[in-house]
Curated annotation (Swiss-Prot):
Gene3D superfamilies for the chain: P-loop containing nucleotide triphosphate hydrolases
Matching NCBIfam families: small_GTP (TIGR00231)
UniProt record similarity statement: Belongs to the small GTPase superfamily. Rho family.
Residue sites binding GTP per the record: 12-19, 59-63, 117-120
GO BP terms, alphabetized: small GTPase-mediated signal transduction
Protein name: Ras-like GTP-binding protein RHO
InterPro entries named among the record's database cross-references: P-loop_NTPase, Small_GTP-bd, Small_GTPase, Small_GTPase_Rho
Organism whose genome encodes this protein: Aplysia californica (California sea hare)
Residues modified to Cysteine methyl ester: C189
Keywords from the UniProt entry: Cell membrane, GTP-binding, Lipoprotein, Membrane, Methylation, Nucleotide-binding, Prenylation
Disulfide bonds: none
Main location class: membrane
Amino acid sequence: MAAIRKKLVIVGDGACGKTCLLIVFSKDQFPEVYVPTVFENYVADIEVDGKQVELALWDTAGQEDYDRLRPLSYPDTDVILMCFSIDSPDSLENIPEKWTPEVRHFCPNVPIILVGNKKDLRNDESTKRELMKMKQEPVRPEDGRAMAEKINAYSYLECSAKTKEGVRDVFETATRAALQVKKKKKGGCVVL
């Protein structure tokens, strides 16, 4: 039986952990060096609920320089991972300000999984000290859940690519969401 093919696109601010999350899931190794993304695609096989799914993983660059290029990733998307970093309250603020409007515009009706990356930094002392200097604190789980509700996300999950905690769960949930969407002949994302 042929595998079911689904397309996942990951979005979020630059340096919020998108590429690391994809690399840890698809290659099971954590990249120690930060390399800003242009566009990288991976394919990963995942089994959920007894179904074999070939998940095409589309990485995107969060930096503003790529705002005009990023929409090229959106056509025929089945599920969106919308990421922020737990050590960056500003990246959470950009979820309703920037990412939700962009995704809803290009991918109406595509399920969104809101993902809090870098969970391991929530209790990291040096991270907390740095944030305190700016009168901020790491994003709390309830803030993430409230945001997921606000943007009408399919689900809210937290993970750490570094420790691998929660990583598989993110992709299993995303795959389930993608499988639930019944595509019309022309459905999916549109580029206008």
